[in-house]
């Protein structure tokens, strides 16, 4: 496969039509999306929520040939949808937003994940789940390549049995 570069149409310094590539071309579009989402939400400004909604809506073009395992590293998280499609789900999808603050060492276990009964077939849940995690990491530029001082892991799966946990302990949360 041959790599084909498709640039963004713009204007050169002398006013002529030009094309170019780079992340800075996405800045005006993402800024407009963020402003549109904020206006549509009509609530206190929450940059992490807006970032999460934009990122969650992004997808790759069908003709994308970059391997799935390399996409985020090579081309980012994809192309975000427009504001109405970000804010309003289709009739066959739902978006669950969980917001909280975690102190160092804390964890959240969601043991009763709200799955609609219509997705239950022969004792198994069917459907697609897309999880998007957005957080505000602790950054320390003096730490070189380890400047990001926050690591969060997301694990999704099922248990054979459900065990009740003592959620009164400081480091265990179950919203």
For each predicted feature, which ranges?
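Extracellular S/T/G-rich loop segment that most often corresponds to the catalytic His/Ser-adjacent loop
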Residues: 1-27, 31
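Long, contiguous C-terminal modules that act as interaction/assembly or targeting platforms
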Residues: 12, 42, 131-132
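Alpha-helical metal-binding/catalytic segments enriched in His/Glu/Asp
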Residues: 29-40
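An often Trp-containing, charged/polar helix-loop segment at the C-terminal end
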Residues: 41-66
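Secreted peptidase-domain scaffold signal
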Residues: 73-160
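Noncatalytic accessory or regulatory domains flanking protease catalytic cores in secreted, cell-surface
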Residues: 165-175
């Amino acid at each position: 496969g041959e790599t084909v570069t498709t640039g963004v149409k713009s204007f050169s310094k002398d006013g002529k039509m030009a094309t170019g590539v780079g992340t800075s071309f996405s800045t005006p579009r993402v800024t407009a999306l963020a402003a549109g989402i904020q206006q549509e939400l009509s609530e206190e400004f929450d940059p992490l929520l807006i970032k999460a909604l934009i990122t969650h809506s992004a997808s790759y073009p069908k003709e994308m040939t970059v391997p799935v395992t390399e996409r985020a590293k090579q081309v980012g998280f994809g192309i975000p949808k427009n504001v109405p499609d970000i804010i309003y789900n289709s009739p066959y999808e739902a978006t669950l937003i969980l917001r909280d603050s975690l102190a160092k060492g804390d964890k959240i276990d969601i043991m009763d994940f709200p799955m609609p009964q219509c997705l239950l077939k022969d004792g198994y849940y069917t459907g697609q789940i897309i999880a998007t995690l957005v957080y505000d990491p602790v950054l320390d530029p003096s730490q070189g390549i380890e400047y990001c001082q926050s690591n969060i892991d997301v694990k999704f799966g099922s248990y054979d049995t459900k065990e009740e946990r003592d959620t009164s302990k400081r480091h265990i949360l179950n919203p």
